[in-house]
Amino acid sequence: MKKEYIRYKQTKKEFSQMIDHMAQLCKIPSISKFSKVNTYPFGIDCNNALNYILKLAKSFGFIVYKDPKKMYGFAQLGNGKKIIGILAHLDVVPEGDKEQWISDAFSPIIEKDKLFGRGSLDDKGPAIINLYAMKYIKDKNLLDSKWSIRIIFGLSEETNMLSMKTYLKDFGTPYISYTPDGEWPLIYAEKLIYHVNLWFPEIPNLKLEAGKVVNQIPDSIYAKYPEISNMQSLFKDGETKYDETKGILKIIGKSGHGSTPEKGDNAIIKFFKAFQEFMPKFKSNALLKFITQNFVDDKFDLENIFPKYEDYSGKLSSNLGMIRTIPGHYILGFDLRVPVTHSRSEIFSDLSKYVAKLNNKIQIEPISTKPAKRIDKDDKLVKILMETYNEHYGENLEPIAIGGGTYARLFDRCVAFGSTKYMHLMHGPNEYFTFSEIKDSLDIYINALYRLQDYDDEK
């Protein structure tokens, strides 16, 4: 029998405490920086974030564990053999163009019932909410003795996921689990993620620099070229800044999540659209041709390179996330979100064919691949969580597929479940979590943790 839905009336005091804990965690600039020789494998800030949340978890009365090598940590309620896992991450993407934030990205503020700050939505806020959901289960004695609940904190989700992979080697996969790092209602399929660099011959005297990570839409580009100040007339007011001393032009775009490139304003593409008009003599250049053939029409499916890459999980999408200038070359970094039914070998083959036709001096440098993830819509885990979500909102929604990548792809019997309907806010300037969504999320996670204990009883 399905358990009755719990409508939790959180006190104003506890809600304020929860928001404060989110804000304190978001103050820590935990951008993951992997090092094999560092005392802190993902940087001291990631370690500080882990220490903060483990201390909080311990104050709630949970069992806490920190990996001796500082790779990950977790907090646990109960001692049952069957573990309900909650997979959260404490690392964040860089803030991007600081001038586009209403406040410092790592000095969280509250405005109009919204918590602004890097990590508020992805994924520190959801981590704190789930800790409070566990606290409710503990305080109300709602955990069956055969179960335990373990929230696992990763420190490199935005980069190589090595932190959570290390946890898997040490402890294995939980009995069932979810990650609060996606989009409501529930994600049953995640596209393959393919990161690749393309090396192009340099255009004489043109120096370019943009982007810090490929899974983030670049919100600015810095360009140096003779008389480039004259290019400002091709942009709207407020879209450029020129440094006369250095002779560098900054073009301003708008950041966002690399899985939804259409929801930002890519500064790299913006620059090249104008540059081909400013310097038409370079239109035959391989880099200019690549950009104009694939990006200037505001489409991101790279159909010229990857024709008919589409299935039930959607179309292929591409984020041109980085560009660097080195002697003789530009290095362009791409984040491809590839439909579930396509493979890494297909991508490399089709990209190689296209590049060979365009210019044989272009080099392909594959960086990393994250495999696709799919779980059946009729799976017991999916059914319990979807029923819980739909009951909360009085809706009848179906699970969805996304281009975003979460820890769910590493684990068996795991899905991405929440915590927002506005995933495009992740990775952008002025990332925020609304109070209404925070309250709804807490309710949903409390009921999810309560009902998942009936997993073995579901048919």
What residue ranges belong to the model's regions?
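N-terminal helical capping/dimerization or prosegment-like subdomains
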Residues: M1-G85, V92-G96, I331-G333, F348, ...
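Zn-dependent metallopeptidase/amidohydrolase metal-coordination segment
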Residues: Q10, P29, G247-K250, I326, ...
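Generic non-transmembrane alpha-helical segments
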Residues: E14-Q17, H21-I28, Y52-F60, Y136, ...
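Short beta-strand
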Residues: V64-P68, T240-E244, L320, P399-I400
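Active-site metal-coordination/substrate-binding segment of hydrolases
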Residues: I83-F153, T159, F171, F435-D440
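Phosphate-handling active-site elements
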Residues: E111-D113, A133-R150, F278-A286, G394-N396, ...
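Midchain, well-structured core segments that form catalytic/ion-binding scaffolds
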Residues: E158, K165-V340
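Substrate-recognition/cap regions that form aromatic- and gly/pro-loop-enriched pockets
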Residues: T325, Y330-I400, G404
